[in-house]
Amino acid sequence: MTLRVVARIKAKPDKVEEVREALTDLVAPTRSECGCVVYELLQNTDDPTDFTFVEEWESEAALADHAASDHIQATREKLKGIVEEAPDIRTYTLID
């Protein structure tokens, strides 16, 4: 059973480009992770401080490995002080 993840990150208004760069740097290494099916980064067209990842993972284990990866840990450090709040990360299963 695959898992879907929606992760929302809110940049501080004066830190949008720094947040965008930090998040963009996650895309390539994450897409190459074992178990990653989809990993897309979106930016809200009406609110440029609002970023969202839409993800699909083959298993809970693959998602857990992703969360523990070096590039995720490094990005968490980079985001300290430049985001409004902790990321809102929600995990879903597909119903239909």
How should each PLM-predicted stretch be described?
Residues K15-V37, H71-A74:
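Short amphipathic alpha-helical segments
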Residues A11-P13:
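Beta-strand elements of well-folded, non-transmembrane domains
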Residues L3-I9, E40-A67:
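Short, well-ordered beta-strand segments in beta-rich or mixed alpha/beta enzyme
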Residues L41-T49, E77-D96:
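Glycine-rich beta-strand-turn "strand-cap" elements at beta-sheet edges
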Residues M1-T2, D96:
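Absolute protein N-terminus
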Residues E56, A67-E84:
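Long, charge-enriched, surface-exposed interaction segments in small proteins/subunits
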Residues R8, D70, L94:
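Alpha-helical and His/Cys-centered functional microenvironments
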